[in-house]
Amino acid sequence: MDFVKGNEACFDRNLRAGHLTGSAWVIDQNRSHALLTHHARLGVWVQLGGHVEDDPDMLGAAWREAREESGLINVRPVLDHIFDVDVHEIPANPKEPAHLHYDIRFLFEADREAPLAITAESKSLRWIALDEITEITREESVLRMVRKTVSVARP
């Protein structure tokens, strides 16, 4: 976490070197499905998450993003510590140059039967069986979380 130590403004999305983001890897109660979004701008299937908006509570930021991006009300943390960390490049777009996201990820659980609400940030939102995720994405950071999910004890 040299990036955090070396950048007091690490939460600021205007920090062009990159910034912290918070993500929610949301699984169902059976630990058999994950909720993924087809990201509107990036065009790939990924976990819910986004900018922390100057909120130093990374778990709280990921939790907020999970609720905002899915419409789910009853999203619960499974672990009280970080589930995964990933650093990835966000391509340049008309509003900002290419930059890095230092993504801090937490594990959450939600009811797969609860209604979902798609936001403008998403082309689609779906519960996908863990063993079928490779059919829609080759993103290693997503596949790594699938592998980690298998190691989390069932309820």
Model regions and ranges:
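Acidic, metal-coordinating catalytic segment for phosphate/diphosphate chemistry
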Residues: M1-S23
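Short histidine-centered beta-strand/loop micro-motifs
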Residues: R13-L15, L35-T37, G50, L116-T119
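Histidine-centered active-site/metal-ligand motif
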Residues: H19, H39, H51, H99-H101
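Glycine-rich active-site/cofactor-binding loop and its immediate structural neighborhood
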Residues: W25-Q29, A34-W63
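Unchanged
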Residues: E53-S141
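Charged phosphate-binding loop/patch that engages nucleotide di/tri-phosphates or the phosphate backbone
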Residues: T137-P155
